[in-house]
UniProtKB/Swiss-Prot annotation:
Family matches, as Pfam families: AcnX_swivel_put (PF01989)
InterPro entries in the record: PMDh-S-like (IPR012016), PMDh-S-like_dom (IPR002840), PMDh_S (IPR020794)
Protein's UniProt name: Phosphomevalonate dehydratase small subunit
Organism for this UniProt entry: Methanocaldococcus jannaschii (strain ATCC 43067 / DSM 2661 / JAL-1 / JCM 10045 / NBRC 100440) (Methanococcus jannaschii)
Coiled-coil residues: none
The enzyme's E.C. designation: 4.2.1.182
Listed NCBIfam families: PRK03955.1
Length: 129
């Protein structure tokens, strides 16, 4: 299945999706190792390590951009797919050099799906559907 969205940050990555149905704040929401520590998150206790993070949109502090940058530079966060990207998440992905596509119907993607995020064209492919 192929979903057409909007390119925010360039690059192409294939990997396993981890999907949240709730908006996410990177400041206080995730630790340095990529573990989700926000107790209000539907992904509390899970890890972003080596995954493509799919969530509706970001919320919270501008420091979140630097958290995303740090996760990307440590090789923990591989890519992002949003329903609606906002400047904090966009800045972090661009600085971190990870692909980001938004305007995607994230309801089509499930945790564990193998996906390809093409930040050059704005396309997300779900390989196992």
């Amino acid at each position: 299945m192929e979903l057409k969205g909007r390119s925010i940050s360039k690059g192409i990555i294939e990997g396993i999706a981890i999907v949240s149905k709730k908006p996410f704040s990177f400041l206080g929401g995730v630790d340095e190792e990529g573990n989700i520590i926000d107790k209000d998150s539907d992904l509390y206790g899970q890890s972003l390590k080596g995954k493509i993070f799919v969530f509706p949109y970001g919320r919270g502090s501008t420091v979140g951009s630097y958290v995303i940058y740090g996760l990307a530079k440590r090789g923990i966060l591989k890519g992002i797919v949003n329903k609606e990207c906002e400047p904090i998440v966009a800045t972090g992905a661009i600085l971190g050099g990870i692909p980001l596509v938004d305007k995607i119907d994230i309801e089509e993607i499930k945790t564990g799906d193998r996906i390809v995020v093409d930040g050059n064209t704005g396309v997300v492919k779900i390989l196992n559907k």
